[in-house]
Curated annotation (Swiss-Prot):
Gene: Lrrfip2
Keyword Lipid metabolism among record annotations: no
Chain intervals with Polar residues compositional bias: 63-74, 110-139
PANTHER family: LEUCINE RICH REPEAT IN FLII INTERACTING PROTEIN (PTHR19212), LEUCINE-RICH REPEAT FLIGHTLESS-INTERACTING PROTEIN 2 (PTHR19212:SF6)
InterPro entries for the chain: LRRFIP1/2
Keyword Phosphoprotein: yes
Record-given protein name: Leucine-rich repeat flightless-interacting protein 2
Organism listed in the record: Rattus norvegicus
A Pfam entry, by short name: LRRFIP
Length: 437
């Protein structure tokens, strides 16, 4: 065999690839170390941001404690849920960034090895210097990608900080708006309750007005009937020539209230007789007339006795007149005079007696009529009192039922408003949970 020709001595392929692999492994280890350091820095920054957000949230909650006292029990839950959501978002963002950076690192650091493995399968040539320059350019690319990743990561972190701050501000504004909405809902509920109360009072007043109108129409109808009755009474009085005598205060009682319609219709003769009896109540005048009647009857009886005595005397005198004709010429004239006087008195007494009997008959008729009217008035008054007692009892019963019904309605309205408020709070909590999820 001949000696090999002169030229550059080639390095063994195994040694060259082992050096490249070692360099690549060193670079990969350094990149992994830098990536782990970045991950630790990101975790520390995330913890710092979370503490800052918690501090801002505590400050905002301490400022808005007067406005959000009504949701004191649900605020920690919402805060925890918000922090959990923020942590989940930050963890998702960091995981996405880590995956992206890992993929970029893996792509950047696996490409040279793939190239080297491909070049290892090809036959060796004299352009190893060019391959070496290509390998160095592929080794420089990860640094540029790392700087770009750092810049993009810093931008993303700034945006994330701004988003967290704006999210906290928006959450505070949302809580304030929720409190204002709840306050306005309470005001609206109070106004609705007031409007319902006003409507109820209006309905009651309208019903009372309708009742008053009905009573007014009934009273107007009764008044028309009474006017018609008065007109017919006046016509009958004028037709029969009667006279209306109003009754005075009974039994001389000055404080007694005058009775409405306490009048009596009598004939003109009876009216004249009652006027002759003097003034005063009708029963007093009737009592006076009865006393006068008794006196007249007693006088008539006395006169009848005197008349019988005179007749007996006359009969005795007639028997003795034959014997004493001459003696009694002077006394006959006196007897005739006395007889004429007696006859005149008897005729006068008879006339008075007949007149008194007529007056007594008319007064008895008026008394019987008045007694009938009194009985009718008494029965009507008793019936009216019974009806009034029944109506009062029914009114008290209806008032009790109305009070019980109003109490039940108020209780039901209170329970309804309470349930409506609870329903609104549950709806608000549900919407808040859905918005946070």
């Amino acid at each position: 065999m001949g000696t090999p020709g002169s030229g550059r001595k080639r390095t063994p392929v195994k040694d060259r690839f082992s050096a490249e692999d070692e360099a690549l492994s060193n670079i990969a280890r350094e990149a992994e170390a830098r990536l782990a350091a970045k991950r630790a820095a990101r975790a520390e920054a995330r913890d710092i941001r979370m503490r800052e957000l918690e501090r801002q949230q505590r400050e905002s909650s301490s400022k808005d404690i007067t406005g959000t006292h009504w949701s004191r029990a649900s605020t920690p839950k919402r805060r925890d849920m918000m922090y959990d959501s923020i942590k989940d978002r930050s963890s998702r963002v960091s995981s996405l960034l880590d995956e992206k950076s890992d993929k970029q690192y893996a792509e950047n650091y696996t490409r040279p090895s793939s190239r080297n493995s491909a070049s290892a399968t090809t036959p060796l040539s004299g352009n190893s210097s060019r391959r070496g320059s290509g390998d160095t350019s592929s080794l420089i690319d990860p640094d540029t990608s790392l700087s770009e990743l750092r810049e993009s990561l810093s931008e993303v972190e700034e945006k994330y900080k701004k988003a967290m701050v704006s999210n906290a501000q928006l959450d505070n504004e949302k809580n304030n708006l929720i409190y204002q909405v709840d306050t306005l809902k309470d005001v609206i509920e109070e106004q609705e309750e007031q409007m319902a109360e006003f409507y109820r009072e209006n309905e009651e007043k309208s019903k009372e007005l309708e009742r008053q109108k009905h009573m007014c129409s009934v009273l107007q109808h009764k008044m028309d009937e009474l006017k018609e009755g008065l007109r017919q009474r006046d016509e009958l009085i004028e037709k029969h020539g009667l006279v209306i005598i109003p009754e005075s205060t009974p039994n001389g009682d000055v404080n007694h209230e005058p009775v409405v319609g306490a009048i009596t219709a009598v004939s003109q003769e009876a009216a004249q007789v009652l006027e002759s009896a003097g003034e005063g109540p009708l029963d007093v005048r009737l009592r006076k007339l009865a006393e006068e009647k008794d006196e007249l009857l007693s006088q008539i009886r006395k006169l009848k006795l005197q008349l019988e005595e005179e007749r007996q005397k006359c009969s005795r005198n007639d028997g003795m007149s034959g014997d004493l004709a001459g003696l009694q010429n002077g006394s006959d004239l006196q007897f005739i005079e006395m007889q004429r006087d007696a006859n005149r008195q008897i005729s006068e007494y008879k006339f008075k007696l007949s007149k008194a009997e007529q007056d007594i008959a008319t007064l008895e008729q008026s008394i019987s009529r008045l007694e009938g009217q009194v009985l009718r008035y008494k029965t009507a008054a008793e019936n009216a009192e019974k009806i009034e007692d029944e109506l009062k009892a029914e009114k008290r019963k209806l008032q009790r039922e109305l009070r019980t019904a109003q109490d039940k309605i108020e209780e039901m309205e209170m329970t309804n408003s309470h349930l409506a408020k609870r329903l609104e709070k549950m709806k608000a909590n549900r919407t808040a949970l859905l918005a946070q999820q």
